[in-house]
Amino acid sequence: MKDRVVLAYSGGLDTTVAISWIAKERNAEVIAVSIDLGQGGEDMETVRQRALGAGAVESIVVDARDEFANDYCLPTIKANGLYMKEYPLVSAISRPLIVKHMAEAAKEHNGTAVAHGCTGKGNDQVRFEVGFANTAPELEIIAPARDYAWTRDKAIAFAEENNIPIEQSKSSPFSIDQNVWGRAVETGYLEDLWNAPTKDVYAYTEDPALGQAPDEVIISFESGVPVAIDGRKVTVLEAIEELNRRAGAQGVGRLDMVEDRLVGIKSREIYEAPGAMTLIRAHEAMEAVTIERELARYKRGIDAEWSDLVYDGLWFSPLKRSLDAFIEESQEHVTGDIRLVLHAGNIIINGRRSDHSLYDFNLATYDEGDSFDQSLAKGFVELHGLSSKIAAKRDMGIL
């Protein structure tokens, strides 16, 4: 009986070629697994049939849109997940979900190995392989693009020699990864840092300079979960999808950054994440109203560590699980409404209300009704600066 290899199948050039290559070079049966993460584009049945046409003995499509939104995007919202304070982890949070379903498929179909199409330069090889080490360590891992130094030209030549049906051509300029949480674009002329992105780079967002009328939105949260938009109840997936449309129409969520990859190189990335950025900014604003100062300060460090761990492929790590527990506890009172305006590429917060608010109008006001006892301030200031004052006297030789 032949070995069975479960392949993470995107429908693109590299993984389509990988089906035939694995079958031929490893004398194995290939089971292609494609995960619907709300990426849009091609119909998933078309993707499934392409895998079969390339030689897969089985081609499985998993509709994981709600699972992705609830179990991966939502924790990112609660953690204000932004790698290097910018990137909302578009690809990084999708990989552990793909790993989960591949491991399940390998178990169900008696797979002996798993395969991916990642190169040796990227982060995804780490995310996949560390993920498998944590969920299915008994499986062999095959990475033909990395281990056999495939290039796009080599992949196309192999496809032509073996009559593999592919739609990509040598003129395809970009590498693109997308899901409902966002879209990542790299390579091509973008590798020259001085080249500005042209309009064909973007698909999820309109040009911010188009002059659309501002769009005012009210996002309601319950314990950190977005539950309504403009008073209409929504699921997490529906919230992301609606804000992708509305924020995307305003050019919100475009990012152009030079990113520090896990493997040690810098990479220029273009991201579009209109729904993700809107939800994260709204969530940050809700936390600012409802989380106590010391907890908020500490959580900012936890959020940054959480984002780094997820980016680095450590979704299944003990530290990540512990941080999840801390973050979940911090969300108890993150409930209320945030009003914001989407316009010309900007997210402008202009209203906040919550029954759990720590904002006390009578303490904050400078007008009539001020209840703040200012007589307490002098002693507070003296004590707050006392240790610094003593150190300064020592340094000046007057202690």
UniProtKB/Swiss-Prot annotation:
Localization in the cell: Cytoplasm
User: Which residues does the annotation say bind L-aspartate?
Assistant: T119, N123, D124
> What EC number(s) are associated with this protein in UniProt?
6.3.4.5
Which UniProt keywords are present, listed alphabetically?
Amino-acid biosynthesis, Arginine biosynthesis, ATP-binding, Cytoplasm, Ligase, Nucleotide-binding
Q: Which GO terms describe its molecular function?
A: argininosuccinate synthase activity; ATP binding
Sequence positions that bind ATP: A8, Y9, S10, G11, G12, L13, D14, T15, T16, G117
Q: Which domain of life is it from?
A: Bacteria
Record pathway: Amino-acid biosynthesis; L-arginine biosynthesis; L-arginine from L-ornithine and carbamoyl phosphate: step 2/3
Pfam families from the xrefs? Arginosuc_syn_C, Arginosuc_synth
State the signal peptide span: none
Which biological process terms from the Gene Ontology are attached to this UniProt entry? argininosuccinate metabolic process; L-arginine biosynthetic process; urea cycle
Q: Which reaction does it catalyse?
A: L-citrulline + L-aspartate + ATP = 2-(N(omega)-L-arginino)succinate + AMP + diphosphate + H(+)
Q: Among the entry's GO cellular component annotations, what is one?
A: cytoplasm
Q: Where does L-citrulline bind?
A: Y87, N123, R127, S175, E259, Y271
Relate the assembly described in the record.
Homotetramer.
Similarity remark: Belongs to the argininosuccinate synthase family. Type 1 subfamily.
Q: Which HAMAP family match?
A: Arg_succ_synth_type1 (MF_00005)
Name by which UniProt lists this protein: Argininosuccinate synthase
Organism, as annotated: Corynebacterium urealyticum (strain ATCC 43042 / DSM 7109)
- This protein's gene is called argG
